[in-house]
Amino acid sequence: MNMHFIDKDEVEIRLPDNWQEKVDVVWQYINGKTAEVEVDVRAKAVEEIWDNDKLEHELKSAILNARKKAINSKSDVWGTMSQILSGLSFGKCWYCESTELRSDNPVDHFRPKGKVAECPEHPGYWWLAFEWSNFRYSCTYCNSRRVDTETSGGKQDHFPILPPPMWNKSRDDVFIENPVLLDPTDIDDVNLLTFNINGEACPNVDDNSSPLYRRAKESVELYHLNHVPTKNARKRICQKVRMLVSNINRLSVQNFEENKLTIKDLKIQLHKMIRVSCPRLLSIQPLEYTLENFIIPMFGLKICWIG
């Protein structure tokens, strides 16, 4: 099983009709706040007779802080996208597939809006703060810095880049960035991650010296994908699926006709479990197809009642 792909075209289709109008109004507000700060700083510079270097430094700092404060004051704007993003993943976190979001505003900025941990001089991708294509539906554990007894992680302000590390530090920069973190909206990225029978997320790349392996490995760490309760939940699902399939196999071989009602009940239980754990699979394919092409390869199962 791989990380699930989210089609950004589906996000765009669901945007509110007045989305761009709302964003334009927000930027007018933000630009107004930074303009006010600039006027105040320049007035103070005249009063205190600053040189150009001090003026430039103070302006940059004041505008940066005013912009950040103004952007954060409008967090309700990207917060309104939460339900739309959630609908594309059946309420599951786009990174770890958890439904335990426990967050009032589970919208992550893939390119962090306030700062970049790996590049101290980066102001953050503030110009993407209200860009819908930069939004990802994320649980608190994937998006916030956390440490437990066995793992640490949380994306927070991290946005590492593969060498050469050329970040776009303004809206005018045009560097081709190569992010380390896997993006669930990238159809190639989702195949770089898989899950083993112990419930652990791990690279789906054999060559551990390749950049692709590094991307998957660091994504597991920074998204906190092996947070112990989440990993154990995956393992429990694997155990239950294996048990149900094993029981259906045994009853089918013994006497299918005699056991068909029990078999049907077990198949219904299996269907319900997959529907809860992997709803996107059953939303487009019947149970047997989902088992044969996704669940069986993932769990290494043999099934004698399909075909």
Residue spans of the language-model regions?
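Histidine-centered nuclease catalytic patch
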Residues: 98-137, 146-167
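Short, well-ordered loop/turn elements at secondary-structure boundaries
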Residues: 88-90, 101, 131-133, 176, ...
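Short cysteine-rich loop/turn motifs with clustered Cys
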Residues: 80-106, 139-142
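Primarily a LysM-type cell-wall glycan-binding module
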Residues: 11-12
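C-terminal, charged low-complexity interaction regions
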Residues: 203-307
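Short, charged surface segments at domain edges that flank catalytic/cofactor-binding sites
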Residues: 17-19, 24-92, 116-133
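Extended, low-complexity, charged intrinsically disordered regions
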Residues: 1-6
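Long, low-complexity, intrinsically disordered segments enriched in glycines and aromatic residues
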Residues: 159, 164-209
